[in-house]
Amino acid sequence: MVAVIIKGNEVAEKKRAQLKEEVVKLKEQGIVPGLAVILVGEDPASRSYVKGKEKGCEQVGIYSELIEFPETITEERLLAEIDRLNGDDRINGILVQLPLPKHIEEKAIIERISPEKDVDGFHPISVGRMMTGQDTFLPCTPHGIVELVKETNLDISGKHVVVIGRSNIVGKPVGQLFLNENATVTYCHSKTQNMKELTKLADILIVAVGRPKMVTADYIKEGAVVIDVGVNRLETGKLCGDVDFDNVLDVASYITPVPKGVGPMTITMLLHNTVESAKRAGVVCK
């Protein structure tokens, strides 16, 4: 068996084409989806991520607004800007690019964003709705992962999903999303004592730990679907995931590569959430 490679970039492009069609129909009704991105400081990685989001908006026809502040901005001023955007009918989604400077409390910033414009899915109300299976904006990377698994046409219901990693951004929420799809979910983390025994039970294995090539063939059940969320840069400058891709290729049935696997889906699901927010708001732009 040689695993089928799930090409996240191709899935993302297909979904963006669908979003573009939806945006055209919304604009015919006078509704223009809008995303505001707040960037604090000059971090090159953050700036690169923001550029990707701007490019995605342009690709599907979403209005985007980049608001930049110096690293010295006060928390009070940043909160005031979020208040302004919460009240701006042209803006359907608000995203604050993390990380923020140490003198600003990220929790306070995230909680100030209106849940109706929380297209990142990080607000406690959004998280609570996700936990209870209510309709809400889902966190972008976990949502993208579920969509990639669905591309395999595997029936998730009743399957055993093992998640390696328990971060608030990926590990915890992705397990909850699979639970909402009626999967049986097991979490593994740095304190798990019998990790290989557990991962070898997985029909679907999600790896999100940030350790290059940690997961090898002996972690994986024959025919499992393997989703590699990790992005690590080796000393050679080459990117690799948390899964030893070549080593696992002959054991898994499906696998995502790094790069061009999970990554392209994250921004695509952000665009999806922004379009959904515009539909819900239904505000005609004048």
Curated annotation (Swiss-Prot):
PROSITE patterns: THF_DHG_CYH_2. Gene3D superfamilies: Leucine Dehydrogenase, chain A, domain 1 (3.40.50.10860), NAD(P)-binding Rossmann-like Domain (3.40.50.720). Disulfide bonds: none annotated. Pathway: One-carbon metabolism; tetrahydrofolate interconversion. GO terms for molecular function: methenyltetrahydrofolate cyclohydrolase activity; methylenetetrahydrofolate dehydrogenase (NADP+) activity. It holds the Pfam family THF_DHG_CYH. GO terms for cellular component: cytosol. It catalyses: (6R)-5,10-methylene-5,6,7,8-tetrahydrofolate + NADP(+) = (6R)-5,10-methenyltetrahydrofolate + NADPH; (6R)-5,10-methenyltetrahydrofolate + H2O = (6R)-10-formyltetrahydrofolate + H(+). Transmembrane segments: none annotated. Its EC number is 1.5.1.5, 3.5.4.9. Keywords: Amino-acid biosynthesis, Histidine biosynthesis, Hydrolase, Methionine biosynthesis, Multifunctional enzyme, NADP, One-carbon metabolism, Oxidoreductase, Purine biosynthesis. GO terms for biological process: L-histidine biosynthetic process; methionine biosynthetic process; purine nucleotide biosynthetic process; tetrahydrofolate interconversion. The keyword Amino-acid biosynthesis applies. It comes from the Bacteria. NADP(+) binds at residues 165-167, 190, 231. Belongs to the tetrahydrofolate dehydrogenase/cyclohydrolase family. HAMAP family: THF_DHG_CYH (MF_01576). Homodimer. Catalyzes the oxidation of 5,10-methylenetetrahydrofolate to 5,10-methenyltetrahydrofolate and then the hydrolysis of 5,10-methenyltetrahydrofolate to 10-formyltetrahydrofolate. This is Bifunctional protein FolD. It comes from Bacillus anthracis.
